[in-house]
């Protein structure tokens, strides 16, 4: 059978067709396209209309090539962001991006209504201004007209599914990033909504991965040249990526390495202790029904911003070359990757230079120096978070699985092994698509819960790094 994975990241999106045959999984990337943020009227948006058009383009290619053999499609995206639907079923506005500044300073205001400790016991999430609950609370405080017109709130993957099928639902793993869901009951939390005066009527039924949302609508079937069911997968991309990891035992952690680095481990139930709150971990849903205990860390956003800046200046930004130069660099300067100055600076290079100057460190002189600085800084942060995970869970961590695009960065993988003292298993690069497709195949009955298909082709390889290497 064939399954479509639509994977939307903060910088790009892909439509991938996966085939499982005799327990072997192969992938075919059908369509790739850029994603970007749009600044308009002092607000930062995602261009959902363009993204949906690209999704349709990918589906047209998939149906043309594979036709009636396609069983279903699953959609995953980044977390927290959402779109609002009016009473006529129309999108009110392009979704606001989590990097918009409307939530600046919102935490203190929210804690006046709902104390931090109580808030954490309910939702179990890391407190970040970007979280859905604070985006929605800022809209309430602004008396946002869009909110008054809204009848439904749909997270980004739910939004794509809605305009494919006409059916509205909130998928569990993406809902768990919102900080509005009770981590124990897995339902929308009445206390959070009432204390912050949030419109609970906008929320939809929470559905689990593997749920069939619906079939592609008739009009779209004609436009796309085919049809299939839309299946809720691990709609938060990290949940899908984690579903691709074939780990045994519990002495392991994962890093989903992309624009963000999401580092954590799996626990059977939410950990809501004061120690977990102090360490700033988040409890989010896993495809398995377990909990992803993790921390959101600024990731390759740092390098992506540098590359964007250098490219605009006409500089050569071949990634492999920069990694090779970084391996030869003797720059030992580091930054605090979570410092707010690196969230959305006008110039990432200048922000890094200023930080080094203020902390009496050597200012990088070459692209290789900047590559090493970023990778070393991330590896140091991973080592710190690893220790916090061990303290919070009472487990020893001996292996770290790095999945996603960042798993291709050999320098980062080597430094992570050295700084954490752990064996690092890097790959597969296509973990998110693999996990997405595995959920669909299980929903179709082609895979059982414990089945792990053999991975074949590009983007499937694993590479191991040892601390002494």
Predicted regions: what they are:
Residues 40, 64-97, 126-130, 161-182, ...:
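Short beta-strand-loop/turn "lid" adjacent to the catalytic site in phosphate-handling enzymes
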Residues 4-5, 17-19, 111-123, 134-155, ...:
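Active-site core segments that coordinate phosphate-bearing ligands/cofactors
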Residues 1-93, 121, 149, 221-230, ...:
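N-terminal glycine/serine-rich phosphate-binding loop of ATP-dependent small-molecule kinases
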Residues 76-79, 209-210, 257-260, 399-407:
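Glycine-rich beta-strand-to-loop/alpha-helix junction loops that act as flexible
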